[in-house]
Each structure stands twice: as structure tokens, then as C-alpha cells.
Curated annotation (Swiss-Prot):
Zn(2+) binds at H142, H146, E219. Gene3D superfamilies: Metalloproteases ('zincins'), catalytic domain (3.30.2010.10). It comes from the Bacteria. This is Protease HtpX. The keyword DNA repair does not apply. Keywords: Cell inner membrane, Cell membrane, Hydrolase, Membrane, Metal-binding, Metalloprotease, Protease, Stress response, Transmembrane, Transmembrane helix, Zinc. Its EC number is 3.4.24.-. One of its GO terms (molecular function) is zinc ion binding. Its main location: membrane. The gene is htpX.
């Protein structure tokens, strides 16, 4: 998922904007007096950004990738794509999602939507042109696995929890700086405001490590689902083809890379912020699974 990721940046922006708004309205001076009410208050704002993003995810995905939804197939490839997704969805026990193709040379695909029965699965033009039918089917099975596992909803809920505690502990830190260090006894001063914003940025980046860890775990689960639906050898073959094309630039919007099959490759500390495990690790996990 992401290069210091639009998804993370969006959530941090929500927190910062919320903090500025609360300061300007003077609300913080009341919520900061009681930790119980503060936690509830932060939960409302913390979940707002992630849940709004979840509910508009299909619309945003279509707009940002210029995905063309297949309503009436015009070619045999589109007909095959619809039939394959329909078959995989039926086997996974979910409602047929919308199916689309987005114009990109790199081989990639993504799934999104606010619930498992109102989803979108889209593949890149490059994937359809260069991958074999078995490999494309395995990629589609992986994305159907994301939908069937409810990964989009779970990720949004985890992000909401993370946002809540980032806002909560940032305000506790801001209050400590304002009262204990700056000795401000007259409401919340500028020290509280600056310290809170600083803490939100730092804690938000640290907390994103938790979100990225979960994202990597769910990739393994989606690979397992793909192997169950399309066969282990086909799933491994698709991942090997993706590995062969790993040097190609990825043009998918950062907000959707978390839900694509092919993630960015990072090493060292940057690996903590990867949305996907390495393709080598994913292939090895499938081989061990048998």
C-alpha cells in the first residue's frame, strides 16, 4: 500500500483539520476535562474519516483509475471476465460485484466496496493483455478473496480505532505540555494546540505501522482464498508473473494500492509501511500451504 500513502495522509489530514476546528470552536476546553467523554468524542471524529472513505470507496476508485464498468460485454474477453467473476463469486458465497477494466500498462487489479455484497473488482488492461487466462483467473480469485473476507470493512474499522486513540493520546499529551510544562492555568493555550498537532502527526505515523501490518496479513489470507478458488499452482503462477514485472512503474492511485494484488517493494524501515508482503514471501507461504 502506499508511499507514505494517500490513505494515511487522508486520515492524518482529518485529524489535523478536526483539531484546528475544535480549537477554533473552543470545544477542546470542555472535552479535555473528562477522559471518558474525551474518548467518546475522539471516537466520533476518529471513525468519521475512515467510514466516509469506505462508503465512497467505489465511486472514488472509478474516478481515480478511470475504470470502465462492464455492463454489457462488447468483446469475448469482457464476456469471459464477467463469467469468471460470476463463477468465483458464486463459489465464494458472495453477490456478484461490479466488474471493470482500468487503463494501465502495469499488471494489477483491485477490489473495493463498503460490504461484501456491494463491491467492485477491476483489472488493468495490461493484466488482460499479458497474462494467461489461468493467471488472470487466479488474480481475480485473490480479489474475490478480499471481498469475501470483508477486508475493506475491517481495514476501515482498524483505521477508525487507530484514529481514535491517536486523537485521544495526542490531547492528553497536549494537556500535559500546556499545564505541567508551560504552567498555563487559563484554559488551553497555544502550547496545547501545537503539542496536540505535533503528537497527532507523530502518533499517526507510528500507528500506521499497525494498519500496514494488518494489511500484509490480509494479503496472505487473500492469497489462500485465491488458491482455494483457482488452485494453488495457478495462484503461485500469477504471483510469479507479477514478480517478473516488478520493475515496471505502478500508476495505481495510492489510496487503492492497499487493495491491489501487486504492491510496492520496500526494504529496511520502509518495509514497516508496506501494504503487501514481498512476492517471494507470498509464493513461499503458498508452497508451504501445499
Amino acid at each position: 500500500m502506499m508511499r507514505i500513502f494517500l490513505f494515511l495522509a487522508t486520515n492524518l489530514a482529518v485529524l489535523v483539520i478536526a483539531s484546528i476546528t475544535l480549537k477554533l470552536l473552543g470545544v477542546d476546553r470542555y472535552t479535555g476535562q473528562n477522559y471518558g467523554s474525551l474518548l467518546v468524542f475522539c471516537a466520533v471524529f476518529g471513525f468519521a474519516g475512515s467510514l466516509i472513505s469506505l462508503f465512497i470507496s467505489k465511486w472514488m476508485a472509478k474516478m481515480s483509475t478511470r475504470t470502465e464498468i462492464i455492463s454489457q460485454p462488447r468483446t469475448r474477453h469482457e464476456q469471459w471476465l464477467l463469467q469468471t467473476v460470476e463463477q468465483l463469486s458464486r463459489e465464494a458465497g458472495i453477490k456478484m460485484p461490479e466488474v471493470g477494466i482500468f487503463p494501465a500498462y502495469e499488471a494489477n487489479a483491485f477490489a473495493t466496496g463498503w460490504n461484501r455484497n456491494d463491491a467492485l473488482v477491476a483489472v488493468s488492461q495490461g493484466l488482460l493483455e499479458r497474462f494467461s487466462p489461468d493467471e488472470v483467473r487466479a488474480v481475480l480469485a485473490h480479489e474475490i478473496g478480499h471481498v469475501a473476507n470483508g477486508d475493506m470493512v475491517t481495514l476501515a474499522l482498524i483505521q477508525g480505532v487507530v484514529n481514535t486513540f491517536v486523537m485521544f493520546f495526542a490531547r492528553i499529551f497536549g494537556n500535559f505540555v500546556d499545564k505541567a510544562i508551560l504552567k498555563n492555568e487559563d484554559g488551553h493555550g497555544i502550547g496545547y494546540f501545537v503539542a496536540t498537532i505535533f503528537a497527532e502527526l507523530v502518533l499517526g505515523i507510528l500507528a500506521s505501522i499497525i494498519v500496514m501490518w494488518f494489511s500484509r496479513k490480509r494479503e496472505y489470507r487473500a492469497d489462500e482464498a485465491g488458491a482455494q478458488l483457482a488452485g494453488t499452482s495457478a495462484m503461485i503462477g500469477a504471483l510469479q508473473r507479477l514478480r517478473a514485472e516488478q520493475g515496471l512503474p505502478v500508476h495505481m492511485p495510492d489510496s487503492l494500492k492497499a487493495f491491489g494484488i501487486n504492491g510496492s517493494l520496500k526494504h529496511g524501515m520502509a518495509g514497516l509501511f508496506m501494504t503487501h508482503p514481498s512476492l517471494e514471501d507470498r509464493i513461499e507461504a503458498l508452497r508451504q500451504r501445499g
